[in-house]
Design a protein with these regions (language model features):
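Conserved beta-alpha-beta core of the PfkB/ribokinase-like small-molecule kinase fold
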Residues: 68-139, 157-158
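Conserved N-terminal subdomain of the carbohydrate kinase-like
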Residues: 1-70, 85-89
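Active-site donor-binding loop signature of nucleotide-sugar glycosyltransferases
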Residues: 35, 120, 171
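Short hydrophobic/aromatic-enriched beta-strand-loop microsegments
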Residues: 16-20, 91-96, 167-171
Length: 177
């Protein structure tokens, strides 16, 4: 269900799509949610893994020496498989969400032990650590592996924690979202 014209749009912008795999008989991953008025809180209404349920990534040879790797929000076992195919990235960044905390906790902890950066929202940081204070949550997350912790705060921007340092990036206030 991924039309060729979408791929053409990417290649037309000179983007390398060598690593894209298309399963003709499968449906794309689907997530549906509802954001509250503050745009910080969300409710997951549906998560359908579809083709990602049995996805086995094959990282193209030309990508394996990448210095920066962003592990997309996929099952932690898929993320571990990608890590195993990389040669020696300088920055290994993890994106995850509450779904994986609820369905693949042990595997998620294994991934976290291997990465040096994690990007997570405030609600998920609290869920992951059991801490309400984001400073304490970031410290606990660092103890799990990543030495750089990015906590996204929706309309309030984001926080970057590294050892004792904290960097705050405010959000740009918008009249309409």
């Amino acid at each position: 269900d991924f039309p060729q014209n979408h791929l053409d749009l990417l290649t037309g912008k000179n983007l390398n799509i060598q690593g894209i795999e298309i399963k003709a008989d499968g449906k794309t991953f689907f997530w549906q949610g509802r954001y509250h008025n503050d745009m910080n809180t969300r409710d997951t209404l549906a998560t359908e893994l579809n083709v990602l349920a049995d996805f086995k990534p094959v990282v193209p040879e030309s990508y394996r020496s990448a210095e920066v790797v962003l592990l997309g929000n996929l099952h932690p076992l898929v993320q571990l498989d990608v890590i195993a195919q990389m040669t020696d990235p300088k920055i290994l960044m993890l994106d995850t969400m509450n779904f994986w905390m609820e369905h693949a906790w042990d595997d998620l902890l294994r991934v976290m032990a291997k990465v040096n950066v994690i990007s997570i929202n405030d609600e998920e940081a609290r869920q992951l650590t059991g801490e309400y204070s984001l400073v304490r949550a970031a410290k606990k997350i660092s103890e799990m592996g990543p030495d750089h912790v990015i906590i996204k705060k929706g309309e309030h921007g984001a926080l970057l924690f590294h050892q004792q340092d904290v960097f705050y990036a405010p959000a740009l206030p918008l009249e309409e979202v």
